[in-house]
Regions:
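Extracytoplasmic
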Residues: 146-171
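Active-site-adjacent loops and short helices of periplasmic peptidoglycan-processing enzymes
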Residues: 1-145, 152-156
Length: 171
């Protein structure tokens, strides 16, 4: 295999065999793949009993007004954590990410700092987060190796939530 991509990592999840590896530790802008770390933080909070799927969070003006992909939440409405998770996974909702970030850490900025700290603790060495959505920022980066590591950790450590990733639509 070969690729013109700056960085790439393809692994056979059944055998663990590396099929393609190119500059896998190079930090790059991860865009919406950052949302995997947002979900990790939410899943961890759920498992620790800090929040529950049926808890509701209020949509802030910031979340409502965020551009890009969204769940189309309305400012001031309350949404369950379960529906916010679906909004992140199925609709790649920037608004849903921000509501979750604010609900867990007070502000998205605080949440991004916690994301970076936790990422290092779980072995993501090339990751730095400035927001919960992957919105472009020169300091917001992840490597291919970190992305695969995180995806595998979510699959292994939070199997009870993994079925949501199979859903194709959400209304």
């Amino acid at each position: 295999f070969s690729t013109t991509a700056k960085t790439a990592l393809v692994i056979d999840n059944t055998t663990g065999e590396v099929l393609l590896s190119k500059d896998i530790d190079r930090p790059i802008p991860p865009a919406s793949m950052s949302k995997l770390m947002t979900l990790w933080m939410v899943f961890e909070s759920l498992d620790e009993g800090k929040i529950e799927l049926d808890d509701t969070l209020r949509v802030s003006r910031k979340a409502w007004g965020k551009g890009g992909s969204k769940m189309f939440l309305r400012e001031g409405e309350y949404v369950t954590i379960k529906n916010l998770i679906k909004g992140v996974i199925i609709q790649s909702g920037n608004d849903a990410c921000i509501v979750l970030a604010e609900g867990l850490a007070g502000t998205e900025e605080n949440f991004a700092e916690l994301m970076t700290i936790r990422a290092k603790e779980i072995g993501l060495r090339s990751s730095n987060f400035t927001n919960s959505t992957g919105w472009p920022d020169p300091e917001h980066k992840m490597s291919s190796k970190d992305l695969i590591t995180l995806a595998n950790k979510i699959r292994e450590e939070y199997p009870s939530y993994y079925e949501i990733f199979d859903d194709l639509e959400f209304t």
